[in-house]
Amino acid sequence: MSTKREDHLRKGADVTPTEALVAGSIAGAISRAFTAPLDTIKIRLQLQPKGFKHRKSVVTIVKNLLENEGIIALWKGNVPAEILYILYGGVQFGSYSIISKSVSKLENNYRINLSSANHSLIVGIGSGIVSTLVTYPFDLLRTRLIANKNRGLLSMTGTIKDIIKLEGIRGIYAGIRPAMLSVSSTTGLMFWSYELARELSNNYQRVPFIEAICGFIAGATSKGITFPLDTLRKRCQMCSVVHGRPYTASHIFVTILKNEGVFGLYKGFGISVLKTAPTSAISLFMYEYSLSFIRKIRVIE
């Protein structure tokens, strides 16, 4: 057995866009299947408005959700979310492969030698921007479906029609700017943290699931730094539904600070880390494993 498992995300890794797209889609689908309920709870926490006598805890939200909407409500918005994760995973890792090669060429042309971690930070930011542009409508749709507190489940097509009817085509991209900032920052920091963790774990490559452990650390680190941007993104996605007219991201940011304080930017932080860290762990592990498996099949053929 090799003492060092291959890191397919490291600077200089020879991964084709097609390989990365397929492995990334598999990783996205599997990670979503395990973390859907945590995502629902996290978004409900983030969307709590000011005005409750008592802020609802995670336990209270879960209890109310099960009593009033049934256990299936934990998977509200899961169909668009599964599509989102499959698309996002494929586009994220596929674009990562393409951008990584482009950045490496620029480094060679301008005689720059970035560390593997800093290389991954830049590439990750780029892949986050591309992935957000492609998959954002599904992210918004997921948020709208999860925010629905009626026992009956809204349909995807019905929700899309309502958004277009009430808000126009632009409504499908409500909150895209803070989303771009949030996702690109989180993605860049995740890949940066992952590469740092992989470098520090060089002497522990025989540890089972070392990729998942490094992915868990990366997910927790990136989310801890960028969580306020994620809250702002969710509020922007819901503002036109709640208030009937669009607000700018800066207006919503100031309103949160004024009415809820800094704490308002961190609503749902605990459950978010509990969801994001395992998601990153599963996603990065499955990407590495799926890519190795795809290559083994090709060798056998």
Curated annotation (Swiss-Prot):
SUPFAM superfamilies membership: Mitochondrial carrier
Top-rank lineage group of the source organism: Eukaryota
An annotated Gene Ontology molecular function: thiamine pyrophosphate transmembrane transporter activity
UniProt keyword annotation of Oxidoreductase present: no
GO biological process, one term: thiamine pyrophosphate transmembrane transport
Membrane-crossing residue ranges in chain numbering: 20-38, 79-99, 121-141, 172-192, 207-227, 252-272
Coiled-coil stretches noted in the UniProt entry, renumbered to this chain: none
The entry's keywords: Membrane, Mitochondrion, Mitochondrion inner membrane, Repeat, Transmembrane, Transmembrane helix, Transport
Gene Ontology cellular component terms for the protein in this record: mitochondrial inner membrane
UniProt-listed Pfam families: Mito_carr
Solcar repeats: 15-102, 115-200, 206-293
Function statement: Mitochondrial transporter that mediates uptake of thiamine pyrophosphate (ThPP) into mitochondria.
Record protein name field: Mitochondrial thiamine pyrophosphate carrier 1
Organism whose genome encodes this protein: Candida albicans (strain SC5314 / ATCC MYA-2876)
